[in-house]
């Protein structure tokens, strides 16, 4: 009986997506709400550590950090347990990556978007039982078609995922099945063998 490492486990996740560009690109294109002309084509890995600018600043580390050929940054986190602080940490890390793009000689027009993809192995939005992908942007209070571009956040509640809930993105289904079912499938097979 073959045994697989849980792809959600910290080290396994970082090995898969932090060392294999093609897998990371596929994951980003499948799970982020990117239009056809916005798809990621190639990436350059960046240090996952966001070191503070001075000794009193807060150090932070993400699971995977990269940028594409357009200069957009992508932060990817796999979080096993939801805590209210996690959402704040995500905002902190994305904001830090965003503001660090410019030094005092560069113009604001050169800022590129930062996308934060957060896979959570716990249900945290119980009020929305049928929704498991949550996308956030900075939008106008009254006119949600008016947005300030720059920071985008995607949270995915893995336990809510059912393969039939996504129809338009086949790769999204495959990646989410990989993240949620590979270890469960092995466990079921082992129980069947023991029975």
What are these regions (language model features)?
Residues 1-195:
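Elongated, amphipathic alpha-helical interaction scaffolds
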């Amino acid at each position: 009986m073959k045994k697989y490492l849980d792809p959600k486990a910290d080290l396994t996740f970082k090995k898969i997506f932090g060392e294999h560009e093609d897998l990371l690109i596929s994951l980003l294109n499948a799970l982020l709400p990117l239009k056809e002309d916005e798809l990621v084509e190639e990436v350059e890995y960046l240090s996952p550590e966001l070191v503070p600018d001075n000794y009193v600043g807060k150090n932070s580390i993400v699971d995977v950090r990269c940028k594409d050929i357009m200069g957009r940054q992508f932060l990817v986190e796999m979080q096993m347990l939801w805590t209210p602080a996690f959402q704040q940490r995500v905002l902190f890390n994305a904001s830090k990556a965003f503001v660090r793009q410019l030094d005092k000689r560069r113009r604001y027009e050169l800022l590129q978007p930062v996308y934060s993809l957060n896979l959570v192995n716990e249900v945290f939005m119980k009020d929305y039982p049928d929704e498991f992908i949550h996308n956030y942007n900075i939008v106008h209070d009254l006119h949600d078609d008016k947005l300030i571009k720059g920071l985008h956040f995607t949270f995915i509640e893995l336990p809510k995922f059912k393969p039939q809930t996504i129809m338009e993105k086949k790769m999204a289904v495959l990646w989410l099945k990989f993240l949620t079912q590979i270890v469960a499938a092995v466990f079921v097979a082992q129980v069947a063998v023991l029975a």
